[in-house]
Amino acid sequence: MMKRLLAAGSICVFLFLGVIGCGGESMAGYQKIPAAEAKNMMDKGGVTVVDVRREEEYKTGHISEAVLLTNETIGNKPPALLPDKNAVILVYCRSGVRSRQASEKLIKLGYKKVFDMGGIKDWPYDVVT
């Protein structure tokens, strides 16, 4: 009898830990992706590309169709440029620091599909001015 109770208890603990572990995987968070993956996503369409550099930097060259939303302007309210919190958002800056910061802010604001593509300095594809 004691062995059965111990076995049943062990199974319950195992199942409980399994459920908790799976729940952690689905927590919201941004994902860091390489330039090639970001380019592939953009080629397929249905994404919003966000440049979080300053306006002067944006004007010197940016990824085609990227919208300018400076990191400093992302605050406590969802940006008007990003009305859909379920949209796929690709974020970049110059070196990757501000894109990480902006991605974290967007996740905290409730955006679900945020991808940090790092810095434009590592972008091997065309840019526009």
Predicted features along the sequence, with ranges:
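Rhodanese-like catalytic fold shared by cysteine-dependent sulfurtransferases
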Residues: 3-10, 14-47, 56-88, 94-129
